[in-house]
A protein has these predicted regions:
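N-terminal amphipathic/basic-hydrophobic helices that include classical n-h-c signal peptides
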Residues: 1-8, 116
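Short hydrophobic helices that act as membrane-entry/anchoring signals
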Residues: 5-33
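Active-site and donor-binding regions of nucleotide-sugar-utilizing enzymes
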Residues: 26-134
């Protein structure tokens, strides 16, 4: 019981710090966007403001371009194995986004991974309603 309480407190503290840092995280993306516009162009995706996806989704998250390249074999197999699903690949950087879009064009969907805050993640998951998450 005490362990559950401590885990709950840790998540609460983590979320509180996240909420306090959110303006700084957004400002950082806006500043980075001065040099690389892609950082600011889709900032609302990171806040969970995305359109509802009405088809079954398989969600694959790749932090880096290297992870994406390593995952292409898996993604290709998922496309073949689940023809009635759309694949959503999320990344955290514009270079990751560019790699996904160049490799798959419109064959898969791409979004930026959301900020790790409860209301953001809940909204994001509600909008994509994934059947499978990897």
């Amino acid at each position: 019981m005490r362990v559950l309480y401590l885990l709950s407190m840790n998540r609460t503290l983590y979320s509180l710090v996240g909420y306090l840092l959110l303006p700084i995280m957004v400002l950082r993306l806006l500043i980075k966007g001065l040099k690389t516009p892609a950082y600011r162009q889709r900032i609302f995706e990171r806040l969970g403001f995305i359109s509802k996806i009405p088809v079954p989704i398989i969600w694959v998250h790749c932090v880096s371009v290297g992870e994406f390249r390593a995952a292409t074999v898996l993604i290709d197999q998922l496309i073949k194995s689940y023809p009635d699903h759309r694949l959503l690949v999320t990344t955290t950087t514009p270079t990751g986004s560019q790699a996904v879009l160049e490799h798959y064009q419109s064959e898969v969907l791409h979004l930026y991974f959301p900020f790790d805050l409860p209301w953001v993640v809940n909204r994001y998951i509600k909008q994509i309603n994934p059947a499978i998450c990897l």
